């Protein structure tokens, strides 16, 4: 095949080894010859042809290594893995020449947390701009940063409230007085439900709600480990989330 190098020492992968003879026979039967010279030619070489911007791919790989480091640190803090697993990721980081300082969104979240003295979060949008969210009496940092990101994406003034406190306060009362929760602040899922309700009568809220798909692929960081609920919302929205390996509170049990 023109433009594809055939290596003397190919690298084999199980699925490539298994399927290559079958595909090779099919191509020879249909076209008279196979475009692939080996298992590697069919697999790794073809994947390499998909890289059209090497700088972008290298940066994406660096960010993935850093994300895995943060995930490993959090898993260790939660008792899921031991220190040896974290050490292996640290070795990988050193070999790749990357550090946590290369994750700009983490620096933004930690700076905001230091300024406010409370947990904070940050999201880096596709255009590179970083928005932050702080903990308030109404919202947790993860909920606040999602709203702020939607405002930025929709060109909405950050001074304009998308959801009236009149809507938020009854939800807080339900959580604390009826359901017995100690934390009155709204989680990410609760704020999105409140936003969708507001969107029925508020065009600005409806505009913000339409921006949700644009969060997919964005980078985010929290200054504390998020709850399972918030973590799940970020994952479902397609946001690449990392967290500092510490909890907001010193409780013995965390959900």
Task: Please provide the spans of the model-predicted regions.
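Short, small-residue-biased leader/transition segments that mark boundaries at the very start
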Residues: 2-9
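Short amphipathic alpha-helical segments, especially helix-boundary/capping motifs
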Residues: 3, 81-86, 122-127, 184-187
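Glycine-centered secondary-structure boundary/capping sites
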Residues: 3, 95-97, 155, 217, ...
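C-terminal binding/interaction regions
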Residues: 10-24, 31-53, 63-68, 79, ...
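Conserved mixed alpha/beta catalytic, RNA-binding, or beta-rich assembly cores of soluble enzyme
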Residues: 12-13, 70-75, 89-183, 202
